[in-house]
């Protein structure tokens, strides 16, 4: 896990937490803190948000099944896929592959966002009072809390 400053001028976040290795379907799944970060973002966003779009609540329920365990399992992959399916409705170029890759900026193609950058942006929107101090969230995993002072 590391911080990145996006180059894109319209970025919804000025800085975001990036993963070092891919997480999800056919991914590296090498770093527990990367997996924890993706799981934490998915779960907290799903717990804090509601959906009014058709199919949105079913996707939210799939994301709520994601454990915050640091192990990439079928529920984590399905949660990533559910997130991407929902975002594809708004950003048609979003790739739905059940995988979060390390981002090189916010967008990978016009209107297609890196999953990890998008998760950062929505988390920031939902929790503006603590952003970027993830460690202040009551459900932040201990491994993430321990790592953040080195990054911020």
Predicted region positions:
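Cell-envelope/ECM-targeting effectors and their regulatory/trafficking segments
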Residues: 1-152
């Amino acid at each position: 896990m590391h911080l990145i400053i996006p180059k894109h001028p319209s970025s919804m976040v000025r800085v975001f937490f990036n993963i070092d290795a891919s997480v999800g379907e056919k991914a590296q799944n090498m770093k527990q803190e990367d997996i924890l970060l993706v799981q934490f973002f998915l779960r907290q966003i799903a717990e804090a948000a509601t959906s009014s779009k058709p199919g949105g609540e079913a996707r939210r329920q799939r994301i709520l099944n994601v454990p915050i365990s640091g192990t990439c399992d079928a529920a984590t992959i399905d949660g990533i896929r559910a997130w991407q399916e929902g975002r594809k409705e708004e950003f048609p170029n979003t790739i739905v592959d059940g995988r979060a890759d390390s981002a090189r900026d916010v967008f990978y193609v016009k209107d297609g966002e890196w999953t990890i950058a998008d998760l950062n942006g929505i988390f920031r929107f939902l929790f503006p009072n603590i952003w970027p101090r993830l460690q202040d969230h009551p459900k932040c995993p201990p491994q993430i809390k321990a790592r953040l002072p080195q990054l911020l």
